[in-house]
UniProtKB/Swiss-Prot annotation:
BP terms from Gene Ontology: L-histidine biosynthetic process; L-tryptophan biosynthetic process
Record gene name: hisA
Catalytic activity from the UniProt record: 1-(5-phospho-beta-D-ribosyl)-5-[(5-phospho-beta-D-ribosylamino)methylideneamino]imidazole-4-carboxamide = 5-[(5-phospho-1-deoxy-D-ribulos-1-ylimino)methylamino]-1-(5-phospho-beta-D-ribosyl)imidazole-4-carboxamide
Name of the protein in its database record: 1-(5-phosphoribosyl)-5-[(5-phosphoribosylamino)methylideneamino] imidazole-4-carboxamide isomerase
Entry superkingdom: Archaea
């Protein structure tokens, strides 16, 4: 299982938001490429980049940093935030992204995944599913859909999604631990890899997620607030059977 550090960018800074709220930040640091390098030096084998300006208002102000991280980090990068068209996804793959993370547009129109998989290949498509109170939410968690994560997950898998990034919004950014059940349901019901995100605060949380069979876990606030030491976490996960 991979432990994947998050580098979330807003206005050319590295930030960690509380429950996705742009006005509530746990962390705000300069120079995202330096932060990315620090995580790789501590053993990260993959990075999770999020362009929050792209996600929140469709502006691509962090491209320069994104390209620098892709070029210089030396590890594969999965990237999301503001990918609202097939062209946006193709642009990031051309720049060297290993996976592009598609959110709202995939849930609203799963057919787009079929088209995208023809263009860039399934293995490069990661669909982001965010759930609140058992239902998938879209548009920056503002709008609740009628689907459960498993229902939409199966549709997206059929359409050609290569993996799922699953965030349990109820736990995200609150630093009070994880609820394993919704993630386990996805792992048990889908064939494609599931990457978990949201609420991880201890190495024990990571080991529980490894136990249920997730492919990777995105860690954010906990490593920025020094609740988890990344190097120790990666070692613990690699040692556990």
């Amino acid at each position: 299982m991979l432990v994947i550090p998050a580098v979330d960018m807003k206005n050319k800074k590295c930030v960690q938001l509380i429950q996705g709220n742009p006005d509530k930040k746990h962390v705000e640091l300069d120079n995202p490429p330096e932060i990315a390098k620090k995580w790789v030096n501590e053993g990260a084998e993959m990075l999770h980049l999020v362009d929050l300006d792209g996600a929140l208002d469709g502006k691509r102000v962090n491209d320069e940093f994104i390209e620098e991280i892709i070029k210089k980090s030396g590890v594969p990068v999965q990237i999301g935030g503001g990918i609202r068209s097939i062209e946006d996804a193709e642009y990031l793959v051309e720049k060297g992204a290993k996976k592009v993370i598609i959110g709202t547009i995939a849930v609203e129109n799963p057919e787009i995944i079929k088209e995208l998989s023809k263009r860039i290949g399934s293995e490069k498509i990661m669909v982001s599913l965010d759930a609140k109170d058992g239902k998938v939410v879209i548009k920056g968690w503002k709008e609740k859909t009628k689907y459960t994560p498993v229902q939409i997950g199966k549709i997206l898998e059929e359409m050609g999604a290569g993996s799922i990034l699953f965030t349990n919004v109820d736990s995200e950014g609150l630093l009070n631990g994880i609820n394993i059940e919704p993630t386990k349901e996805l792992v048990d019901n889908l064939k494609i890899p599931i990457v978990a995100s949201g609420g991880v605060t201890t190495i024990d949380d990571l080991l529980k997620l490894k136990e249920i069979g997730v492919y990777g876990v995105v860690v954010g606030s906990a490593i920025y607030k020094n609740m988890i030491n990344l190097k120790d976490a990666i070692e613990a996960v690699n040692k556990s059977n």
